Design a protein with these regions (language model features):
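Hydrophobic/aromatic-rich transmembrane helices and adjacent perimembrane loops
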Residues: 129, 139, 185, 338-389
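Membrane-interface transmembrane helices that cradle and orient dolichyl/undecaprenyl
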Residues: 2, 107-112, 144-168, 176, ...
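Short acidic/glycine- and proline-prone juxtamembrane loop motifs at membrane-interface regions
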Residues: 32, 126-139
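Membrane-interface alpha helices of multi-pass inner-membrane proteins
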Residues: 161-180, 190-193, 211-215
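Loop-to-helix entry region of an early transmembrane alpha helix in multi-pass inner-membrane enzymes
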Residues: 67-71, 79-96, 132-133, 288-297, ...
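Signature aromatic-anchored transmembrane alpha helix within multi-pass, membrane-resident enzymes
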Residues: 382-414
Length: 446
């Protein structure tokens, strides 16, 4: 049997490589509109003392409520006035997301599956491709906090433990709300778990969490009273959309479910796949064309094979939950691993519900909150399949890790959002020079 000691070098090596890849992505990001919105809010707060009470402009819904995005960028700048300070905080929060998820995976699964989770989550190009300063990049932390707190609340515990976990559960939803309008994904999961008796809240903790979220949103609510434009989309086409638009048009639901399968496969976002141009070889046309062709053939061939495994895994996951999905917990015994599988099933339901209600067609970043949960069926299937095959599985995982590292290195240096010629700090400093209001005030230099 594989022990924790056997996988320790591979585990810590993978963790370290993931950190290095995150730093490479961060350094070579192309600073565009979403990052500039975050930076503007942070620098206004840190340098001008103006803390905006609303977040980034969202698709068809106006600005995201709350000032969390300003604080996430501005507070690190107060501690260290460098473009790298908010970026380092972001990467640290993403590492914390992995740690929270890993604590539960370590408790429920074998060391081999834990190693697989590190690969599928921490080294996945789906995850690392978001190592840039924009609001969806923070969402894995709140997804992880939501899942971790729910796992702690599956049984009735001590008062203070359940109080803290209940408050954190609400805060996970409330803080996600202040970064992206995809927060209902978490709310639907919580609703299912509560209605089916699979989560036992401490109501004092719930009230405390609601109070904290309410206090953090109060300045935004006051702002909407005097500036209603921040709560609605100015684009007439977007205004024509309505709640339930996805259900009427059906395709948005289908596309969202495809993303659920793609997240745990290696059919990566087209921004990564089709954005790679191997521009360093543009001077040699035949080699340039050959590299692009080989890249796409390999990516789509490996992606198709991985998608087949993902479909098998989701089918296996369905067999684990179909008898329990609509039965309240008190009607039957339930193991922690069954609870884990049901949480994943709840995530699928949340994708369907939110895609049906949303006034837009989801892109991959709209569903970032469920990316970790899309891996759950794969972990369940791998735990079943790897019995007696641990050494073979570890060899497969090593090859898979090499593949993911190679894809990440290419994407971090030559894709639609990243390129070896981009310098993150240089772009930010140029932006600051072009916007005098964000320049360092003399008083803050003393």
């Amino acid at each position: 049997m594989t022990t924790q000691k056997n996988i320790a070098p591979l585990y810590w090596g993978g963790l370290f490589i993931g950190i290095l890849l995150s730093l490479i992505y961060a350094q070579h990001q192309w600073v565009m509109a979403d990052q500039l919105q975050m930076l503007e809010k942070g620098y206004l707060g840190a340098r001008a003392g103006i803390w905006l009470n609303y977040g980034n402009v969202a698709s068809a819904m106006g600005n995201v409520p709350g000032s969390l995005s300003a604080w996430l960028v501005g507070v690190p700048l107060l501690l260290w006035d460098s473009p790298y300070s908010p970026m380092l905080l972001l990467l640290a929060l993403r590492l914390l997301a992995f740690v929270l998820l890993d604590r539960v995976v370590r408790e429920l699964f074998s060391p081999t599956v834990r190693l697989a989770f590190m690969l599928f989550f921490w080294l996945s190009p789906w995850f690392l491709y978001d190592s840039l300063l924009y609001n969806p990049a923070y969402l894995p932390l709140f997804a992880a906090l939501h899942f971790w707190s729910a796992f702690q609340l599956r049984e009735k515990g001590a008062f203070w433990s359940s109080f803290v976990c209940s408050a954190l559960h609400v805060l996970a939803i409330g803080m996600a709300m202040q970064l992206h309008y995809s927060w209902p994904l978490l709310a639907v999961i919580s609703g299912y778990l509560f209605l089916m008796g699979r989560i036992r809240f401490n109501w004092f903790g719930i009230l405390a969490g609601v109070a904290l979220v309410g206090l953090s949103l109060w300045p935004y609510l006051h702002e909407t009273m005097i500036n209603s434009s921040i709560s609605r989309e100015a684009n007439p086409d977007a205004q024509a959309r309505y709640i339930g638009w996805g259900l009427v048009h059906v395709y948005p639901i289908f596309k969202a479910l495809i993303y659920w399968l793609r997240y745990s496969s290696w059919i990566f976002t087209t921004k990564l796949v089709n954005g790679v141009e191997f521009s360093a070889f543009a001077a040699v046309p035949w080699l340039h064309w050959l590299l692009i062709a080989l890249w796409k053939v390999v990516i789509y061939a490996v992606g198709a094979a991985s998608l087949w495994l993902v479909i098998l895994a989701n089918r296996y996951g369905w067999t684990q939950v179909r008898a329990s999905l609509w039965r309240r917990r008190r009607e039957q015994a339930e193991t922690p691993r069954t609870w884990f599988a049901l949480y994943g099933a709840a995530a699928v339901m949340s994708v369907i519900v939110c895609a049906a209600l949303a006034p837009i067609v989801f892109s991959y970043w709209h569903l970032t909150l469920v990316f970790p949960f899309a891996l759950f069926p794969l972990l369940l299937w791998l735990e079943h399949w790897s019995l007696g095959r641990e050494h073979k599985v570890r060899r497969y995982l090593l090859w898979a890790a090499c593949y993911c590292i190679a894809v990440n290195l290419v994407a971090a240096h030559d894709s639609r959002k990243f390129a070896y010629g981009y310098d993150y700090a240089g772009q930010v400093n140029l932006y600051l020079q072009q916007h005098p209001v964000l320049k360092l005030h003399p008083a803050s230099q003393e």
